[in-house]
Amino acid sequence: MSVVIINTGCANLSSVKYAIHRLGYNPVISTSRREILRSKKIFFPGVGTAHSAMHALKKLNLLNIIKDVQQPFLGICLGMQLLGSYSEESQGMHTLDIINFPVCALKSEKFPVPHNGWNNVEVCKNNILFNGIKNNSKFYFLHSYVVHVNEYTIAKTAYNICFSAAVNKDNFWR
């Protein structure tokens, strides 16, 4: 099975590639439109700012390709945030608008920001993304921005506020 990890130049590619490899797949790291469209599954990791990642996607001519893919697509960290419609980061900017949600700054007077640590994740809706994973399992978080719980939320957690840990719309997951 063909698995592609989109390379925006703003991602933790080696850790994602290693994790996918441990599941028995040989992922390809690529910016090729052809490889992306021919793949069976797509991973879209990201680290850094929404502005730099959106700039990279535009420069690589991948904005419309990502919006048009039909195969399963998993956004990880910044990759998830870019699937939304708007980010408060960098004085606010429009993102890919694949799933209608804003990405908001995590604000807390009680806890340090960025949020850095392990949280229990509560599955809110039955979804293939969590097959074989026990409800309230721990996941690692390192972020300063959140997606509030919304109609696309399939799992949530809390750090000062409750927020989406995973969302799903059609073939797009985060």
Swiss-Prot record:
Catalytic residues in the record: 77
UniProt keywords, alphabetically: Amino-acid biosynthesis, Cytoplasm, Glutamine amidotransferase, Histidine biosynthesis, Hydrolase, Lyase
Domain of life: Bacteria
Pathways involved: Amino-acid biosynthesis; L-histidine biosynthesis; L-histidine from 5-phospho-alpha-D-ribose 1-diphosphate: step 5/9
GO cellular component entries: cytoplasm
Gene3D superfamilies noted in UniProt: 3.40.50.880
Name of the featured protein: Imidazole glycerol phosphate synthase subunit HisH
